[in-house]
């Protein structure tokens, strides 16, 4: 196996596993080969290995790996971030040491800025703690966003933090805190991404993509004069087998002349650049849609339930008026019945009691519920209509792309 084959194979394996690890669990890939590979690598193969270990070694290896896996995947730790920074630092050092003297001053001028930017934004993402919800800032976080009464409802209490959950927040078991406007926990920065550091994460993705593209371009500028890159003389294009044979020969020649430090790093940069840029494009889509990663997953569950015909919509003001009327009609002696007691408790859950008054440009009177039997809530059938698609639901957090961007980069 030649050096080119080894480089390409290593890059392909790293890129493929990274892509599957990052995107395999997304709802969009649930019924695709990527989702299947994610379940294969993360669920089925580990279960098969556990059975083999249990029969041969009594499960001792699985137990030891389980403790290690619990630390790596269920405890906040810097392992993934250190691997990421090690690859970034090692690749940059190898390339600059071998190619520094072959680059012009104009090419070298942007290097300090392009190279240091990912380190800066990684630091800002990893060290920011202001999005953690604590008793000291809890009241302020309650007034960040209004409750939409779909994904977020008032008076819900975190069982771990023992604080009422602000709208758009989520508890992170790895960080041990509820996180304001939680997007997701990112092992690459060993921290949750939320209200006050999400924009740094976007900058990290952009800076990393720019670094890889620029690094690949520098590697190509060094290798280009060393190889015979003349495809026009044979009058072919990439749809001919001859073109691919020529490309293979050129790549092999480049690998031998540039070595791992230049050709290898350049290929690694060129082939992995789509990963951060693709993830950045996905997050730009989320911003355009007025969602976080956490909310996108929640909406996907609602979408599936709507397709099953088990979701109903009503005007919240009508439901509250109906509940108030029911409470007024039920006398004290009737409350002693178990069924009516449950009904009154349910009515109280739907009240607006304790909901903070939030200054937000969009408001909605909608309320949606899901039922197990596919029928509207008992006794209130006339208030609810069945809905089949998310287009029938208003997302109050979507203010339009420009205002959504402003909310990300200039949070209130």
Q: Across the structure, where does each feature detected by a protein language model lie?
A:
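Membrane-associated feature with strongest affinity for ZDHHC
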Residues: 1-171, 182-185, 189-412
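Secreted, short cysteine-rich peptides and small extracellular cysteine-rich domains stabilized by multiple disulfide
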Residues: 173-177
